[in-house]
């Protein structure tokens, strides 16, 4: 008898075997902050050394609080999970508070990703910071 495994279960097992923590896997599978924002207040893009491309969309509300953030990503599971975790860390914060997040903060949320994917966390944070800094500069 052959047991069927869902695609999600198969991906979860593959990512776990590769060294991704449960939160990182969930972020990757759910991709809840993927996409773009119509009429975004700021759009910024970075290309990682590995060739991954991240574009961040920011919607900023009253008193410089971040109302919404979305990423469009051409990249691996590490890039996607890192970007999704970064959104959870900045959403609802002020621009200045959001600029305080760092690679270590994102890593803690993800719990674990393979060492060879740590650059993905750096890319997610740098892309976010670039967007936040550009917003501040353009709206000073």
Where are the language model's segments positioned?
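Short, thiol/selenol-centered motifs that function as redox-active sites or metal-ligating centers
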Residues: 50, 73-81, 120
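Alpha-helical support elements that line or immediately flank enzyme active sites
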Residues: 78, 82-93
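C-terminal binding/interaction regions
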Residues: 1-38, 42-43, 61, 93-140
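Short Gly/Pro-enriched turn/cap motifs at secondary-structure boundaries
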Residues: 45-49
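Short beta-strand elements
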Residues: 52-64
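Short, glycine/acidic-enriched capping/hinge loops at junctions between secondary-structure elements
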Residues: 55-57, 69, 82
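Immediate flanking context of iron-sulfur cluster ligation sites
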Residues: 64-74, 111
């Amino acid at each position: 008898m052959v047991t069927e495994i869902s695609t999600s279960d198969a991906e979860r097992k593959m990512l776990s075997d590769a060294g991704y923590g449960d939160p990182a896997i969930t972020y990757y599978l759910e991709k809840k902050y993927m996409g773009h924002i119509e009429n975004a207040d700021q759009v910024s893009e970075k290309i990682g050394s590995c060739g991954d491309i991240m574009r961040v969309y920011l919607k900023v509300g009253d008193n410089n609080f971040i109302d919404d953030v979305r990423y469009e990503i051409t990249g691996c599971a590490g890039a996607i999970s890192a970007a999704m975790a970064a959104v959870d860390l900045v959403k609802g914060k002020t621009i200045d508070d959001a600029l305080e997040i760092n690679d270590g903060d994102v890593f803690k949320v993800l719990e674990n990703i393979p060492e060879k994917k740590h650059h993905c966390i750096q890319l997610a944070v740098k892309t976010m910071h670039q967007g936040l800094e550009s917003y501040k500069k353009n709206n000073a």
